[in-house]
Amino acid sequence: MTRYAVLLRGINVGRAHRIAMADLRELLTAEGHAGVATLLQSGNVVLDSDRPAGELVPSVEQALEWRFGFAVPVVVRTREELLAVVAKDPLGSVATDPSRYVVSFSNAPVPAEVQERLAAVDPEDDVYTVDGRELYLWLSLIHI
C-alpha cells in the first residue's frame, strides 16, 4: 500500500460545501482505504491505498459527489512527493517567513497558457515559480 495525502479543494469554507471529517473518514474507509486520518476541518486527509494516484483521484472525487451531493476537486501526493516539494524550496532565498510561503498543487503540470497569464500579472514584490505540478508563491506583503 502507498501512503497518500489527499487534498480536497473548496470544502468547509464559509457555509457552503460543508463536510464533517468523521463522515469523510467513514466514506474513505468504506471505499477500501486504510489508515484514514484527517487534519482539523481542512479536508486534508492521509490514507493508505493499493490504487495508483491516477485512479485514486477520480475514485475519491466520484465517491465524494455521490455521498455529499456536490463536486469536490481532489489533488493527491505521495509522502515522497511532498518531501520532494519541501526539499526543492525554489524560493528559499527570498521566502523568509514560512507563513507567507504558499505551494499550490495540481494533478497535472501547470499548462503553458496559465503560466503565460501569470507572467502577464504584475506581482509587485511577490515572487512565484512554476515547477511541474506545483506553483510556489512567496507573498512579500499581505495585500489589503
Can you describe what each PLM-predicted range is?
Residues 58-109:
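Helix-adjacent hinge/juxtasegments
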Residues 35-54, 73-88:
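Short, charge-patterned binding micro-sites
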Residues 112-126:
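Non-DNA-binding regulatory cores of transcription-related proteins
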Residues 2-15, 101-104:
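Short glycine-/aliphatic-rich beta-strand segments at the starts of folded cytosolic domains
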Residues 52-57, 111-115:
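Short, conserved charged micro-motifs
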Residues 15-30, 112-114:
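Short amphipathic alpha-helix segments
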Residues 142-144:
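Conserved small/polar residues in nucleotide/adenosyl-binding loops
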Residues 46-51, 105-107, 139:
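Short beta-strand-to-loop capping motifs
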